[in-house]
Amino acid sequence: NTDQSFPGFVGSEMWNPNTELSEDCLYLNVWIPAPKPKNATVMIWIYGGGFQTGTSSLHVYDGKFLSRVERVIVVSMNYRVGALGFLALPGNPEAPGNMGLFDQQLALQWVQKNIAAFGGNPKSVTLFGESAGAVSVSLHL
């Protein structure tokens, strides 16, 4: 289904303490201009939130306008935040730290392997973000 955030979570509900949440968060959103391009530039958005909160499902991060107007493929990702993403307990293999960055790295690898099937060029990828997302971009360089 187009124009639907997976898993149907509209983002703003994350502030409601009664919202049921899950660590199952490794999802990508992909916006493709119509008609499907051939060899399009890819822009990957990483949201901010101080590495503590956030989701790529917020309406403000909807990439369809950018994709349509600029004829680029826009990808956004979710990654683990807070203790699930960044808790580090030295010497404990259960909490090595920076798992949220590894989630991001996994998303970047997926884009490299699969974006051509969406009409994207894996050799023309731009990372961008705000706040912790911008810091993440610098950490992946």
UniProtKB/Swiss-Prot annotation:
Glycans are attached at residue 39. It holds the Pfam family COesterase. It is an enzyme of class 3 (hydrolase). Substrate binds at residues 49-50. The keyword Disulfide bond applies. It is found in: Secreted. Present in most cells except erythrocytes. It catalyses: an acylcholine + H2O = a carboxylate + choline + H(+). PROSITE patterns: CARBOXYLESTERASE_B_1, CARBOXYLESTERASE_B_2. The active site is at 131 (acyl-ester intermediate). Its EC number is 3.1.1.8. It comes from the Eukaryota. The keyword Membrane does not apply. Esterase with broad substrate specificity. Contributes to the inactivation of the neurotransmitter acetylcholine. Can degrade neurotoxic organophosphate esters. Homotetramer; disulfide-linked. Dimer of dimers. This is Cholinesterase. It comes from Sus scrofa.
